Amino acid sequence: SSPDEANQAVAEYKTTLNIQEGDTVDESITIPPQPQTSVVVMDQYTGEVKAIVGGRGEKTASFSLNRATDSHRQPGSCFKPLGVYAPAIDTGKYTLASLIEDSPYTYSDGTPVNNWDGKYIGQATVRYAILHSMNVCAVRTLTDIGIDTGMKYLENFGFTTLVSKEDDPAHNDYNQSTALGGITNGVYNIELTAAYAALANNGVYTKPILYTKVLDHDGNVILDNSTPETHQVVKDSTAALLTNAMQDVIKRGTGTAAQLANGMPASGKTGTSEYSTDLWLAAYTPYYTCSVWGGYDSNKPMENIYNQTWHEVMWKNIMDRVNTTLGLQVKNFTMPASVEQKTVCSVTGLLAVSSCPSYTEYFAKGTGPTQSCSGHYEEEEDDEDDDDKNKEDSDSQNSQDSEDNEDSGNSDQSGDNNNNSGNNGNNNGNNNGNSNGDSGTVTPPEE
């Protein structure tokens, strides 16, 4: 809300207080700038929080409020890589080349699941679904792998605000809308940053720390916090595959406004809650992980704000300064030995043969397709002469459907929040690269 709107609300409230002439009234009005923001910058290898911003504007009241650690907000599509695709790939049920049906779909209670752009393309690979933040694909995939599995991974990623069945058997986060970040309480910025830092650190989660040691006046160590808690939350191959897929988000997806000036690679995911109430970018370089949140303290929608990428620009400006100030050299993300490449058919997801439209994809070793595509041929018959009925076969390679021309500047609408839908058990994902039908064509990743 604007200061004028806030002052008007105060004036209206004061009319209800029945203040009489001669009464002494003491008032203090503080109006923080809106919308607000929070930022966390973390060293993904040590867990050290290098920078934290709890809000913007000069603090004149509520000195203890830190929005990065105290305010839980809806994460939107930032949850898709963590609660959907990380477990899907880590358990071996899906690969980046697996095909997912992208067509009209409903939650188990009958509520439609809508893609943020209102479009469907028939089939999409996991990589393409991440790139274009496709809601239907995310919900179908979580439903297929099991909501319990998704929740287990989210808990291992360090989120403490999730509502379990034990906490509330009737209203909890064990529902399909969790795939889109539609959860009961939202998440803290510092916890979302730590979760993405785990992907940046070969799948190793490190609990964030705000200090390393506390010394007394004689230099004796009173508190030693230099060795934070760690655990492996996903395989190094899973982390590498998601990192590679989410680089596409920054290169040509919903996070292009965050591209760094010096060519430093970045990988991450945007998130937008319903009506643009919350805007997120959680992303990392080979050095640091940073998450930026933006929104009104009052949960006022921001859907009418023209610039929906200001939080991405903020992320870029912060990380550009980090890279410049510290003199960080450009280096690329690396692939572990547990990952291999295979050439697959972009229509079926099977191993490509000479007649296939194909592309090269990364796989965790042992999870890629082993069956070869049968090829793509059409028979054409020449005109038959009564005396000589010779036939000539001509191969006609199927051309790939062109991909939807998505506007990469649009934010990704994550669907309704707090929609407690049960698991309907639909198995619409196609595992290990096998075909899921002929209802569409998948666009391969661009190199």
What are these regions (language model features)?
Residues 142-145, 152-157, 165-174, 207-212, ...:
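Short coil/turn segments at secondary-structure boundaries
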Residues 47, 74-100, 129, 194-199, ...:
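Active-site SXXK
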Residues 372-447:
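Ser/Thr/Gly/Pro-rich low-complexity, disordered linker/stalk segments of secreted
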Residues 1-31, 35-43, 51-53, 58-71, ...:
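A penicillin-recognizing enzyme superfamily signal
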Residues 84-93, 101, 105, 131-135, ...:
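Sec-exported extracytoplasmic/periplasmic mature domains
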Residues 93-150, 175, 217-243, 247-248:
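Conserved catalytic neighborhood of penicillin-recognizing serine enzymes
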Residues 41, 46, 71-77, 118-122, ...:
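Secondary-structure capping and boundary motifs in well-ordered enzyme cores
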Residues 111-114, 146-192:
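Mid-domain, small-residue-enriched loop/turn segments at the edges of structured enzyme/sensor domains
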